[in-house]
Swiss-Prot record:
It comes from Salmonella dublin (strain CT_02021853). NCBIfam families: PRK09288.1, purT. The lineage of its organism: Bacteria, Pseudomonadati, Pseudomonadota, Gammaproteobacteria, Enterobacterales. This is Formate-dependent phosphoribosylglycinamide formyltransferase. N(1)-(5-phospho-beta-D-ribosyl)glycinamide binds at residues 22-23, 82, 286, 355, 362-363. InterPro entries: ATP-grasp (IPR011761), ATP-grasp_carboxylate-amine (IPR003135), ATP_grasp_subdomain_1 (IPR013815), PreATP-grasp_dom_sf (IPR016185), PurT (IPR005862), PurT/PurK_preATP-grasp (IPR054350), PurT_C (IPR048740), Rudment_hybrid_motif (IPR011054).
């Protein structure tokens, strides 16, 4: 039984979002629909989720003392991380003191570090992954590359959105790749993972919900990546029944091993009937924004329902749908969007995130579309995104 209090009243149910970007904004909206009091926290003011929260705080979330202070002040019933760059040691301490971290502090800590989740998947669970080695010095990096072989990929163990990643084809690239990885790590210089290149037909995100009534799966989401970030996603991604079964088995093993209730974005490589584990996020996934138009319950609604202890039941997928990002390049603290009227229409929607500024390339919105098939849906979403003119 789930008891929910009313926001801003003494018995309010309080949810604190650690990370207030576009994904957190949608989680906040789902909480608001249930009358929950929302507190949004991020490292910069006026972040998207702060626009729809009851209160907000600006702190360095890697600062454990600052994180503990704001949590102690607000006394949330649920702490919901939206990003990886958080003082997870502090979250584990707070969870040990009785606070509820979504899905659990262990999952948040393991997945913020590629080494933690890779060792769990490959070495503890025995799941198929790419070949890999870890390195914490330039000399051991060279040894790792020699062991894995060319071509290979190097990534900081703590980074996101492609930061610090390089595709290495020859020894001449090693020095530059090492330096780039040291610059791109979330917590500064440090360990890297060297991965062998996996031959695959396509990548999917399998949105997997662990709830009081068991583990549930959304239809697989296909996506296209460029420069470490997704550009388009679509649902459902066509794949063989055997590959889908294997993908679901891998996802089930991973989310149950991580523990807790919530939605997980499980990233997988698919080659024919073979499926290889890549990564997992213990929270809604950017490629899953397509579910805002493709399902009766979006990934955000599913996440909230699960961590509140409510049953998920069946997930209804409406049919072929796609998302395409609005990704301008400019510098402005007063962004405007023109021609939006030409982007929307029957079966086509636009979401603008409300980010306060841009300095370079930044994802500021997403177009969503349905279609007779996923190919048509992708075309419609891309066309809608291209029609939005971003100025500043």
């Amino acid at each position: 039984m789930t008891l929910l209090g009313t926001a801003l009243r003494p018995a309010a149910t309080r949810v604190m979002l650690l990370g207030a970007g576009e994904l957190g904004k949608e989680v906040a909206i789902e909480c608001q629909r249930l009358g929950i009091e929302v507190i949004a926290v991020d490292r910069y003011p006026d972040a998207p989720a702060m626009h729809v929260a009851h209160r907000s705080h600006v702190i360095n979330m890697l600062d454990g003392e600052a994180l503990r202070h704001v949590i102690t002040e607000e006394k949330p019933h649920y702490i919901v991380p939206e990003i990886e760059a958080i003082a997870t040691d502090t979250l584990r301490e707070l969870e040990g003191e009785g606070l509820n971290v979504v899905p659990c502090a262990r999952a948040t800590q393991l997945t913020m570090n590629r080494e933690g989740i890779r060792r769990l998947a490959a070495e503890e669970l025995g799941l198929p992954t790419s070949t890999y080695r870890f390195a914490d010095s330039e000399a051991s990096f060279h040894d790792a590359v020699a062991a894995v072989g060319f071509p290979c990929i190097v990534k900081p163990v703590m980074s996101s959105s492609g930061k610090g990643q390089s595709f290495i084809r020859s020894a001449e690239q090693l020095a530059q790749a090492w330096e780039y990885a040291q610059q791109g790590g979330r917590a500064g210089a440090g360990r890297v993972i060297v991965e062998g290149v996996v031959k695959f037909d396509f990548e999917i995100t399998l949105l997997t919900v662990s709830a009081v009534d068991g583990v549930h799966f959304c239809a697989p989401v296909g996506h296209r990546q460029q420069d470490g970030d997704y550009r388009e996603s679509w649902q459902p991604q066509q794949m063989s029944e055997l590959a889908l079964k294997r993908a679901q088995e891998i996802a089930r093993h991973v989310v149950l091993a991580l523990g807790g209730h919530g939605l997980f974005g499980v990233e997988l490589f698919v080659c024919g009937d073979e499926v290889i584990f890549s990564e997992v996020s213990p929270r809604p996934h950017d490629t899953g924004m397509v579910t805002l138009i493709s399902q009766d319950l979006s990934e955000f609604a599913l996440h909230v329902r699960a961590f509140l202890g409510m049953p998920v039941g069946a997930i209804r997928q409406y049919g072929p749908a796609a998302s395409a990002v609005i990704l301008p390049q400019l510098t402005s603290q007063n962004v405007t969007f023109d021609n939006v009227h030409a982007a929307v229409g029957a079966g086509v929607q636009v979401r603008l995130f409300g980010k306060p500024e841009i300095d370079g390339t930044r994802r500021l919105g997403v177009a969503l579309a349905t279609g007779e098939n996923v190919e048509e849906a992708v075309i419609r979403a891309k066309k809608a995104a291209s029609r939005v003119t971003v100025k500043g």
